[in-house]
Design a protein with these regions (language model features):
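Selective for proline/serine-rich intrinsically disordered segments
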Residues: 1-3, 53, 101
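Ferredoxin-reductase
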Residues: 12-96
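Short, Lys/Arg-enriched N-terminal segments with co-localized hydrophobic residues
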Residues: 2-10
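FNR/FR-type flavoprotein reductase catalytic core
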Residues: 84-217
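Extended hydrophobic/aromatic-rich secondary-structure runs
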Residues: 9-13, 200
């Protein structure tokens, strides 16, 4: 079993990407589609750094890449509105451009798992988006994909349909309002099989559990 972080030496690029569309997919959760040449340099599991179009906002916002369409040169990002900076991003519309820096993060190495093997994808909350493109590319190479995703409640559940298009999906909610009541650990601790590769993104507590659960495999 392999944990899959991909380290590479890359050149950081900055480009004004064009917003193709934006919509709210859950309360305070937005999905934005961006278009531009630098999409060709994006990899699964990475994120973009967006410059908020407001001179008072000096720091870029890191946003996970959810899907990549290399043919259309489009990338989908998903983010949660937390404070003023992301609130400004949520008001942007199709046709506007946004200063974008990529690639950011090591990403996931999908080369370590082969056709016919099993990959376990584990995500919590806003950590779920980068698993979507990961699942799509793994499925395309013949890997069996099993996803376990956890949320606070039914209203917070996102991207379940896109992950189901790639394989089996288990959904947990803290309050039991949707799917299985509990946490991702509730499901994973009941598995009687061992994955060949694990890809995970979420809160520190969840990642600590994943490290502990699979450290001896």
């Amino acid at each position: 079993m392999t944990f899959c972080s991909l380290e590479r030496v890359v050149m950081i690029l900055v480009e004004d990407l064009t917003i193709v569309s934006q919509r709210e997919i859950a309360p305070r959760i937005f999905e934005m589609v961006l278009k531009g040449e630098m999409v060709a340099d994006m990899q699964v599991g990475q994120f973009v750094h967006l410059k908020v179009p407001d001179p008072s906002k000096l720091l870029r916002r890191p946003i996970s890449i959810s899907e990549i369409d290399y043919d259309k040169k489009e990338a989908t990002i998903v983010y949660r509105v937390e404070r003023e900076g992301t609130a400004i991003l949520s008001k942007m519309v199709a046709g506007q451009t946004i200063d974008t820096m990529v690639p950011q993060g090591n990403g996931f190495d999908i080369s370590v798992v082969d056709a016919g093997e099993k990959a376990l994808l584990i995500g919590g909350g806003i950590g779920v988006p980068p698993l979507v493109e990961t699942a799509k590319q793994l499925k395309a190479k013949g890997v069996e994909v099993i996803s376990v995703i956890g949320f606070a409640n039914k209203d917070a559940v996102i991207l379940e349909d896109k992950l189901r298009a790639c394989g089996d999906v288990y959904v947990t909610t803290d309050d039991g309002s949707y799917g299985i009541k509990g946490y991702v650990s509730t499901v994973i601790d009941g598995f009687d099989w061992t994955p060949d590769a694990v890809y995970s993104c979420g809160a520190p507590g969840m990642l600590k559990y994943v490290d502990s659960k699979f450290e001896n495999h």
